[in-house]
Every structure is written in C-alpha cells, then in structure tokens.
C-alpha cells in the first residue's frame, strides 16, 4: 500500500483580472471568460500525515472537517478515476478567507491532487488527464494545477496560458471579511439579467479575449489593439488599457484588456461597503481597481510603492485584512 510522507503544503489563491459572464448553459451552469492570476498570499497550510485508511480533514474550524471538504472530494475523485491515493490525514489551517472570490478551497484541492499523482514516484496521470479529474472536483481547480496566469473560458475549466507581464507593479489585495455566496451572486445576476435590469454585456467580448491575451506582450502604448465591444450595435473602438492611464509605458499593463467584472453590479448593490473599498483604492492612487470573482475581495494596481503602502495602512487602521504584492 502506498504511503504519503509527512509534510506541510502551502496553497495560495487567485484573483480575476477580468471576468465576464457570457451566457447560461441548459444545465444551469454559467459560461464565462476570465483571466486568472495566481497570488502567493494569503495562503492555507495543510499538514499531511499518513493514515490507515481513507482521508480525514481536521481543523480548528468545525465547518472544515468531514467528508464535505473539497480536499476529501479531490481524494475520492482521484480514486474513482483509477488512481490509488494513499490514506492520509490533512490538518488544515485556513489563511485564505471564505466567500472572498480567491479560490482558496480550489487551491487546496489542486495541491492534494498533485500530491496524490506523484505519491508513487512517477506521475499516475498525465497533465491532461489530471486536469480532467480536477475539473470534476471544481471549476477553478484545473487553474491551480498550472498556477500561472491563464485565460479561462467555458465554466472556467478551459485554460490557455496568458503571456501577462505585470512586473514592477504593486498589487494591494483587500479582504474585508464579508462572505459573498457564489451561488447567490449567480442567481442575483440571473434575476437582474432576465428582468432586463442588468444587461450581461461586458467590456471584453469573449470572442476577442484569446486574441487580446495573445497580444499582451507585443502591444505598445502607440499600437492599441482594436476589437469589437460586447454590445450589439456599438461601433468598433480602440480598446482601453487595463488601467485608465495614457502615459507612455515600456511595459503596458494590458493595452488589449478591459478591467471588468460582471459580478460588481449585483454584488455592490447588496454590499455597498465593497464599492466604497474599491473607491478607496482608486482615491489612494490605484491605476485600476476591481472586485475578484464573485467577491468580496478587491484589488488595486499601483505604479507607486508609497501609494500602495498608504492604501495598505488605510485598511490596516480599520482592521481590514490587506496584502501587498510586488508583481
């Protein structure tokens, strides 16, 4: 019988640099186009120990224990696919907040799948096969197997690496402690869309997203990418950059992309404090700010380190969790 060595695994999180809901499938799942970007902090810690049978998740939080944890789902899905996962106990210490749109649980699942796949030495499944298993565990799980910037389509499981270079920028991630239910956010979007109160049109049409990502490295400030907008009847326009800035930039943030999130309209209408946090990031000098996923976390992109640190201090003084990343 295979055994897993005792070890501690650290799993991070992600943000969505843009997210547009493009439709609803007959089975109720939502199609989208999004750009995942991995972050190393906040993070969860998983202490892995060998066990006699099955998989057990322990935590100081009772709601994380038991078979409903996504870690258990990953273990059982791996076994059902023909793998031979070693018995293990996982002691989980959460650092990634729940209901924040950061994918902490998905990152846990991906880390466990990678561990299981190499438990016997040589990988049991190919990268492609493991990604298919990951998609059965959760829509965001395949991304964390890559853990590099990726364009995602479908329900988030169809991934293409994105040549995105944000080096030199400072990212301020704000985690307000508000939990936003992803099913609630989708249902709210459906209600507003079907009532005509919220048009599903985003600023980055799905059909142009792959081409936009392909040009991230080659598009300069004097050569903006042109693309149709997502709403019928609009004329062809020159795409704005990821930020609202116009100055010359040897490393444009993303002249081909729109910074957009379909969930902001519906989530901000119910959680007005999140809109205020976004405005605070912009007021402190962020070149751009956005909510990640279905919320509640938000991030701002800063050129200036001092401005990023000032924004961090603002939230720290109000006992709001905040993280600064130099990209």
UniProtKB/Swiss-Prot annotation:
EC number(s) reported in the record: 2.7.1.148
Which InterPro entries does this one have? GHMP_kinase_C_dom (IPR013750), GHMP_kinase_C_sf (IPR036554), GHMP_kinase_N_dom (IPR006204), IspE (IPR004424), Ribosomal_Su5_D2-typ_SF (IPR020568), Ribsml_uS5_D2-typ_fold_subgr (IPR014721)
**What are the record keywords, sorted?**
ATP-binding, Isoprene biosynthesis, Kinase, Nucleotide-binding, Transferase
* Record-level Gene Ontology MF annotations: 4-(cytidine 5'-diphospho)-2-C-methyl-D-erythritol kinase activity; ATP binding
Q: Which GO terms describe its biological process?
A: isopentenyl diphosphate biosynthetic process, methylerythritol 4-phosphate pathway; terpenoid biosynthetic process
- Residues reported in the UniProt entry to bind ATP: 97-107
Protein's pathway = Isoprenoid biosynthesis; isopentenyl diphosphate biosynthesis via DXP pathway; isopentenyl diphosphate from 1-deoxy-D-xylulose 5-phosphate: step 3/6
The catalytic residues are: 14, 140
Pfam families in alphabetical order: GHMP_kinases_C (PF08544), GHMP_kinases_N (PF00288)
The enzyme's first-digit EC class, named in words, is transferase
TM ranges: none
Question: Which ranges of the sequence are coiled-coil?
Answer: none
Reactions performed catalytically: 4-CDP-2-C-methyl-D-erythritol + ATP = 4-CDP-2-C-methyl-D-erythritol 2-phosphate + ADP + H(+)
Family the UniProt entry places it in: Belongs to the GHMP kinase family. IspE subfamily.
Which function does this protein serve? Answer: Catalyzes the phosphorylation of the position 2 hydroxy group of 4-diphosphocytidyl-2C-methyl-D-erythritol.
Full protein name: 4-diphosphocytidyl-2-C-methyl-D-erythritol kinase
| Species of origin | Oleidesulfovibrio alaskensis (strain ATCC BAA-1058 / DSM 17464 / G20) (Desulfovibrio alaskensis)
Taxonomy, top ranks, is:
Bacteria, Pseudomonadati, Thermodesulfobacteriota, Desulfovibrionia, Desulfovibrionales
């Amino acid at each position: 019988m295979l055994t897993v060595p005792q070890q501690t695994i650290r799993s991070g999180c992600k943000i969505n640099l843009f997210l547009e809901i493009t439709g609803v499938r007959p089975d109720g799942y939502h199609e989208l186009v999004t750009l995942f970007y991995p972050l190393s902090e906040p993070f969860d810690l998983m202490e892995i120990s060998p066990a006699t049978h099955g998989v057990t998740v322990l935590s100081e939080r009772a709601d994380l224990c038991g078979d409903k944890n996504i870690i258990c789902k990953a273990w059982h899905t791996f076994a059902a696919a023909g793998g031979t996962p070693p018995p293990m106990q996982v002691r989980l210490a959460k650092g990634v907040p729940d209901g924040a749109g950061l994918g902490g649980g998905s990152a846990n699942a991906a880390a466990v799948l990678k561990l299981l796949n190499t438990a016997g030495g040589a990988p049991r499944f190919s990268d492609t096969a493991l990604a298919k298993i990951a998609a059965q565990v959760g829509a965001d799980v395949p991304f964390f197997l890559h853990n590099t910037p990726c364009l995602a389509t479908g329900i988030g499981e169809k991934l293409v690496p994105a040549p995105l270079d944000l080096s030199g920028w400072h990212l301020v991630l704000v985690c307000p402690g508000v939990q936003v239910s992803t099913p609630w956010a989708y249902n709210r979007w459906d209600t507003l869309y079907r009532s005509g109160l919220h048009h599903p049109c985003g600023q980055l049409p799905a059909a142009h997203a792959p081409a936009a990502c392909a040009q991230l490295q080659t598009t300069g400030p004097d050569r903006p990418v042109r693309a149709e907008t997502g709403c019928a009847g609009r004329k062809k326009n020159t795409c704005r950059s990821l930020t609202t800035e116009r100055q010359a930039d040897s490393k444009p943030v993303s002249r081909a992309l729109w910074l957009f999130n379909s969930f902001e309209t519906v989530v901000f209408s119910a959680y007005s404090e999140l809109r205020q946090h976004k405005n605070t990031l912009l007021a402190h000098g962020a070149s751009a700010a956005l909510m990640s996923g279905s919320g509640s976390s938000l991030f701002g992109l800063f050129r200036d380190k001092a401005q990023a640190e000032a924004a961090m201090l603002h939230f720290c003084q109000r006992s709001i969790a905040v993280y600064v990343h130099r990209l």
